[in-house]
Every structure is written in C-alpha cells, then in structure tokens.
Amino acid sequence: MGKHEFLTPKAIANRIKAKGLQKLRWYCQMCQKQCRDENGFKCHCMSESHQRQMQVFGQAPDRVVEGFSEEFLDAFLTLLRRAHRHSRIAATVVYNEFIADRHHVHMNSTRWATLTEFVKFLGREGHCKVEDTPKGWFITYIDRDSEQAVKARLKRKRIKSDLAEDERQERMIARQIERAQQSMGKTNGELGDDASPDGSEGESGSEDEYSDSENDHEGQEEDAKEANKAAGKIAIALQRAVPGPKVNPLDDKPKVKFGFEEEDEVSARDKEKEELAKKKGKDAINAAEARRSALDELMKEEEKAKERSNRKDYWLCPGIVVKVMSKSLAEKGYCKQKGVVKRVIDKYVGEIEMLESKHVLRVDQDELETVIPQIGGLVRIVNGAYRGSNARLLSVDTERFCAKVQVEKGLYDGKVLKAIEYEDICKIFH
C-alpha cells in the first residue's frame, strides 16, 4: 500500500500525530526514535542500526545510563530554574512541562525508575527543598547563584576588614617602636648626667699638661724663687697694716668622734641603700609591666588570627537547636518553630527534625536562626575563634546583642568570653 498524497487528509493527520507526544513504551532512547505503534517499534528493534546501538550499550551499560541520568538532571533543573525559580510547585507539574518536549531524555533510560525516587534524590543532594504532602511531592528550587553573590560580597567585606586591621596593627607597632626609642634616649641621657666631671678625662688632661710643662720646669724654678721672695715681702707688709682674724687654737686640734656621729653616718648609708632598693624595685615593676603588656598584645594578635581563620560563612552542625524562619513554610505551620539539626548537607543545608511534629525538613541556613538557652544552659560556639567548643551561658546583654559564656572541656577549658554575638552560639539539644 503506497503512501498518501501530501495534502490528503490522511497525510495531514499523520503529520499532526507525529508532532505530538507518543507513548513512552514505543520510544527508543539509544536511537532517539519514536515509534507510533507496537508493530513499528518491533520492526525498529529488528533493524541493523538498533542492533549496533545495543552492541555499544552492552560494552558499557553503566556509563550509558549515567550519561542519560546527567542529561535528564541538567535539563530538569534548567527548566525548574527558568520557569519556577522562586516558587513552590508540585513535582508532577514540572515533570509534565518537561516531557512536553519531544526530544527530552526519557526517565526510563535513567537510573531513577519513578518520579518519587527522582524527587527524593533532588532533596538529598540539596538541589531543591522537598516536601511530602497529602497532595503529592512539592519542590522549591534552591537558588545557588544568589547565594554565591552574597558569599562573594561577604568575602570582599571580610578582606577589607582584614586589610584595615593589618594597617591598625602596623600603626600600633610603629608607635611602640617610637616609644621604645624615646625611652632608650632618656635612659642614655640620665647615664650621661650621672658621669663625674673629675673623671679620667680630667686626669688625662692634667697628665698631658704636666708632660708639656716638664720641658720648661728648669727655667721656671728661678722665676718662682724670685716671685716667692717678693710675695713674702708684700705679705709681711700687709700683716702689719691690717689686723688678722682671731684664731681659735682648738680648731687646729683633731676632733674626737663620738658614737652619735657614727650612728648618723650609718643611718645615712642605710637611707641611701633603701633609696637604691626602691629605685631598683620600681625599675623591676616597670620592666614586669612592660613584659606583661607585650604578652597581652601577643595574645590579642593570636586571638585575632584565630578569629580570622575560624570565621566561616557557614555555621550549621549536628546536635543544635535552631528556629525555622522560612516564610514559604508558614503555610504548613513550620515558621518560627524549633527543630534539631540531624544532618548537614553541603555545609549550607540542614536536615531539621521539628520538635513538635517530628517532621523532617531540609532548610537552608539563611532561613534558620540560632536559639539562646536560659542562663546556665549549654551552648555550642558555631562560628568564630572558638568554633566547635561547648560552653556554659553565664549572662546575656540584650542591649549589645551579645552573651557571656565560659568554655567547658577541650583545649580552652575555663576560658571566659565576655562578649560573643548571638549568631555565634546556639543551644545544644539534650
């Protein structure tokens, strides 16, 4: 029986049927050929081209199935990202839109046998937020592109703050060097003032003068004798003209020292020793304070370095109590409800078991908040320098939005953190 003419009703009907979606069981994924009925599909399976494709499949079946699975996943997520980027929608609706394309990758050629299994895979891998409801499975696409932009902005902000902190440290070190140089200059000046004017330089100068005058010593002796004679004559004349002062004959006698004078000398020496001891004590105290301040500065620098290394943009960890703040979950009654983090997926998505309903949800950390316990309760430090440590809540400052905690167990046991932000601590589930 020959083919129908091009413009006959039968030919037009055949072309219309070929454009639409046919039965999936008559589609060959390896050959990418759609058959219209069972007889046509049987004839295709007996063809040489199909037999060659089946030989290729038999050589590496796992690789072929994995390739089709990747194509199916990429195409499905592309459709979900473009058409339903920020909406919560039924999985069957998205799947019907996906298979509307005649050339789509069929699910029976992938490693997922059913749509339910595929939806569970999306939730398990963190591609979508998955909810099982009486009306079926609902999915919400997790927009990783906007998250990457936020992370990049936070990273740039953190780099700027680190650069500013480095500049402040450099200025502080420069000021310390200037103060040290000034203190060294003052100590050198004090040592120069304490030097005696009748020191070795004066002695050496007198020796030089004495050595220079040795050559003229013989010639000056005769002049000195004549000058002494004249001076003696003048002194005798003056004694006769002007009466001298009264001389006490007892002044020339040696004085007798009694015990009181010796005690005064001893007490003076003791006072000098006490003053020296006080001066040395003050110097020792100043040196100790300088060492203590240097040690404090080193500890502060180490604390800042630890803060920079342990400060991350993700904070979820298993075993903590969090509060769900997602508006999309408000319809189900999960908004502002507390749950326990059971598992963390890709660092940013948490598997939360609600405390009241015991339902398990997968929620991004941006839609979660930390929970602060009562005074005396146990918390976990989820971010910052002491990330991963358990601590005891001591007090809460509601004006500054920070808390005072004491680290328990571990390397920093007993250390008190006076002001740690609410976002860096979270209640531990008992």
From Swiss-Prot:
Chain intervals annotated as zinc finger (C2H2-type): 28-50
CDD domains linked to this entry: KOW_KIN17 (cd13155)
Keywords on record: Coiled coil, Metal-binding, Nucleus, Zinc, Zinc-finger
Coiled-coil ranges per UniProt: 147-183, 283-312
UniProt feature, compositional bias: Basic and acidic residues: 261-278
A cellular-component GO term for this protein: nucleus
GO biological process, one term: DNA damage response
Pfam families given in the database record: C2H2-zf_KIN17 (PF25095), KN17_SH3 (PF18131), SH3_KIN17_C (PF25092), WH_KIN17 (PF10357)
PROSITE patterns linked to this entry: ZINC_FINGER_C2H2_1 (PS00028)
Record bears the keyword Ligase: no
Signal peptide segment: none
Major location category of this protein: nucleus
KW Methyltransferase (keyword) present: no
Ranges spanned by the short sequence motif Nuclear localization signal (NLS), renumbered to the chain: 155-158
Biased composition (Acidic residues): 191-224
Region of interest (Disordered), ranges: 179-230, 261-284
Cellular compartment(s): Nucleus
Region annotation C-terminal subdomain B: where it falls in the sequence: 376-427
An annotated Gene Ontology molecular function: double-stranded DNA binding
Region annotation Winged helix-turn-helix (wHTH): where it falls in the sequence: 51-160
Protein name: KIN17-like protein
Organism name: Oryza sativa subsp. japonica
